[in-house]
Regions:
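Short stretches within intrinsically disordered, low-complexity N-terminal or propeptide regions
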Residues: 9-12, 32
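Active-site-adjacent core segments of small-molecule enzymes
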Residues: 32-386
Length: 386
């Protein structure tokens, strides 16, 4: 049915995975695999595995921390095999449409229960925003169906952060995809998926069985997406986050959408990089605006452990809490593109008020950190927050 196995929806799933999908590592010149091998295959010992917040509905899966470590090993295998002797690319979201400057402005008139963390008072923060395709292929044509990513790094955010090895970082990251739900919940299921992806053709054929019917359906829906302009697309966090601290904490999800309903048409004969061209055209000729939204959970039936089920807006509406303003700019330069690849995004680059929730997010902590370090080491590149 498909001419190319990597275009098959079931295979593309592996390129979407949140544990390294939404993570954005940094790359420079590659070191040899032999040089780095002695430091590989184990997550950072500096990072503790997250505990579960039972009050917000979190629960640890059996052997979750072990599965997390094994998933990190499988993702590292994927990177080392694909990028042996070359520049270590991201395991997924390898193709950026651009890293652009933005201003995140927190609004004054927002519900009192949402005024927590960086949303606690009206203020503006500079930010970097990276738009990307979900695939692990950096040369994959934009016209092919794919997940589309948006990673926001908010700068100059005071306060101690959650990552033990970067507590004084001045950044707060938000990671989003243009689909509201993820395709897997259980750590064991995801590990099975990664082993199938790293296996032979027979193993790859087992991917739909690893995901199950619902997971395969979600993955297919996510990876068939085609868009005209990254700035005219809506994005979701897919997984939940804590908002606030102590007795005032709650579970929420995030979304970012354009300020207007304007939609460009996809070119009749799009070239392979038409999304970068659309981004350049928009910001060369004017500014752009997007809205940052928070969706508070309204019922405990909205599980923080079930990232495969959407919190329906009819039951839990989103509230606008901030705007992202993109001033006219030139971003497609060698220096800025390199800077973009040297950025690393993680949902755990966060204030305690924005702690990630759920199994997907818990596993992301160590996996993102491990894969980021592997890539930096392979590329002999410094690893630090801007």
């Amino acid at each position: 049915m498909h001419k190319n196995s990597s275009a098959h929806p079931a295979y593309t799933i592996g390129k979407l995975v949140c544990f390294s999908t939404l993570v954005i590592g940094c790359y420079s010149h590659a070191a040899t695999t032999q040089t780095i091998a002695q430091n590989s295959m184990t997550p950072s010992p500096m990072l503790s595995y997250p505990t579960a917040d039972a009050q917000l509905g979190e629960r640890l899966y059996p052997n979750e921390a072990m599965y997390s470590q094994q998933i990190g090993v499988e993702l590292e295998k994927l990177i080392r095999k694909r990028d042996a002797g070359g520049v270590a690319q991201r395991d997924v979201h390898a193709k950026a449409h651009g890293c652009v400057k933005a201003q995140l402005t927190i609004l004054d008139q927002i519900p009192a229960n949402l005024k927590k963390g960086i949303f606690s008072r009206p203020q503006s923060y500079p930010a970097w925003v990276r738009f990307s395709n979900g695939s692990h292929h950096p040369e994959r044509p934009d016209k092919k169906g794919d997940a589309r990513g948006m990673a926001i790094k908010v700068m100059n955010v005071p306060g101690q952060k959650l990552l033990e090895d970067e507590p004084q970082a001045s950044t707060q990251d938000f990671i989003l995809i243009n689909h509201p739900v993820f395709f897997a919940n259980e750590p064991e299921r995801y590990l099975s998926l990664m082993k199938d992806i790293n296996g032979n053709l027979l193993k790859k054929a087992m991917i739909p069985f690893a995901l199950g019917f619902k997971g395969t359906k979600i993955a297919f829906q996510t990876t068939r997406s085609k868009i005209a302009n990254p700035l005219q697309t809506r994005y979701w966090s897919m997984v939940p986050y804590q908002l606030g601290l102590d007795a005032n904490r709650s579970a929420v999800k995030y979304s970012v959408r354009p300020c207007t309903a304007q939609q460009d048409a996809i070119p009749k004969h799009p070239d392979d990089n038409y999304l970068r061209a659309a981004l350049k055209n928009t910001l060369s000729n004017g500014s752009a605006c997007m809205e940052f939204l928070i969706q508070p959970r309204t019922s405990n039936a909205m599980s923080v452990e079930d990232s495969m089920t959407e919190w329906k807006e009819s039951d839990a509406p989103f509230y606008k809490v901030a705007t992202l303003q993109f001033a006219p700019q030139t971003f497609d330069t060698t220096a800025q593109n390199q800077m973009c690849e040297n950025l690393s995004f993680s949902p755990w680059h966060a204030l305690p008020e924005h702690r990630p929730l759920g199994a997907t997010n818990r596993m992301r902590k160590g996996i993102y950190d491990h894969i980021s370090k592997v890539r930096h080491e392979m590329n002999v590149a410094p690893r630090q927050e801007p």
